[in-house]
């Protein structure tokens, strides 16, 4: 088969013909095969739609999660081995204890920030902003993905010393993979780029991120509903459940293949008595636990938001964060690791345990103060005993109550300080462990008050402090994140459902306090970082129904009549840098007929140069006509009325992911509302002057 290439040379008026032979045998067979493959692709996409990509998303994230856990486990074991080999040399053990997390944290910060500054933190506040319709550049790029994976692995390898997790970053990582798979789907299927499809993939990705950390698909989907989206389409349930189930199943299956488990079991094993896990009078103490978690959650949210803002405002820390972020992270790691050194204050903080071991020990079904009083000779082993992790909380100088209280007080401010580090890190697992410690302290206190148990109907049942820890974990984490899905997460992660009613009660009570008094952890971060995210209207007391759009809209807008010429367009386009401009029927009626994009106006100016400025020869090449004839005017499919209330406008902005909307009165354009005006109106009503 041959192909003729024609090369034309204008100057010499010569034409050269080159005949190039291309070997393509069996043209008919090749044409038939290509046709059948195209039909197969169309059939598969018609049947499966985007299910293939959701399956791939779940499997990829499960592989990444397992690989990261495996790597972190080896790194932590190496650090533990090094501590053991150094023997009784306290100085070398101290240097080993602090240098390890300092090096990892500094490298995590430096590596991630050198690739992209958007890789720090959990990523959930930014993802919430993206799901609300705002475009944030480079937050979902593959470059950011690589920086976050390497940085997060180093962060987790620092161990429980830094007291950080991986849930938030994994939601962010899952969203990056989903965005990439979405672009791949567009190119493979030959579809146009659909923002709705992209939004659906990102919502499913949030569920996958949680499910591949805890192996909990149901709570992952509920997390994506509660935390990530202001409005959730029911059709996304199937996508979320399918992708999350695939991810959770593969993640748990890999643990079996790696001989970590004999079969698919709970991530955090418990051994509570199922036949009679709690007595009815204990519901009073469960309610108290919910109140305690709610109040401490409010204090934590306030202090965390204040410190995060203070670090950005303070001249010393802001200069350090601007010029040398790894140094700031190293200094914070030095402070925290020095405090948690096991030969010093760390012996009262169970600092030798990993995050998973901390949670498992707090869920222990023994009553610690009774066990220690009956076995006063118990002493901690030089090595961590995996069968008696709870002994790490025992100390001859402190009671169990003192150790737990000291842990809660110290971890409260150390974790708040760790959240200011500009490196990839998650903050859900720490608050989950912190809540378990609060619950354990309350449970041990109740067991001290009723050492024989609470009698009901002549039957005395002992108090199980581990059950209180199991309720405190979802209650406190739910209070901090303003979610109820943490209750279901506790059920799925432990395989325990005996305390279902007390857990839900604790979570609801704790949420009642924090939702009334403080924004959630993620919303607070959005506020401090000043991300373009609409605040929620949480109370009807601010009279959002009584405020009309006319009261907070921006009446100063640039409009173009349909018959606008060169001078009119030039005047408007130089007066503002808007991306689009409203077009009216004429200057007298001001009836809105559509919008025109800024690039079209620039092209209009380039092709319709002013005849007054053009020379005699240039006038012949100029196009004639006005704006309506030369530009494509897009119709306005949505607009607000001056009588639309603030509450209705806010609801529509969230539901339709709007960035701005024009305001009309009897068809005449009178102003526009952007997210800036909406946010200011809500803040003015919530905080009247």
Curated annotation (Swiss-Prot):
Residues 553-613, 630-689 form the CBS domain. It is a multi-pass membrane protein. InterPro entries: CBS_dom, CBS_dom_sf, Cl-channel_core, Cl_channel-K, Cl_channel_volt-gated, ClC. Chloride binds at residues 122, 428. Its main location: membrane. Residues 1-51, 523-689 are cytoplasmic. Ca(2+) binds at residues 260, 262, 279, 282. Glycans are attached at residue 194. N-glycosylated on a single asparagine, probably Asn-365 or Asn-375. Keywords: Calcium, CBS domain, Cell membrane, Chloride, Chloride channel, Glycoprotein, Ion channel, Ion transport, Membrane, Metal-binding, Repeat, Transmembrane, Transmembrane helix, Transport, Voltage-gated channel. Residues 117-128, 204-225, 350-361, 466-498 dip into the membrane without crossing it. Gene3D superfamilies: CBS-domain, Clc chloride channel. Signal peptide: none annotated. The keyword Chaperone does not apply. Voltage-gated chloride channel. Chloride channels have several functions including the regulation of cell volume, the stabilization of membrane potential, signal transduction and transepithelial transport. Belongs to the chloride channel (TC 2.A.49) family. This is Chloride channel protein ClC-Kb. It comes from Xenopus laevis (African clawed frog).
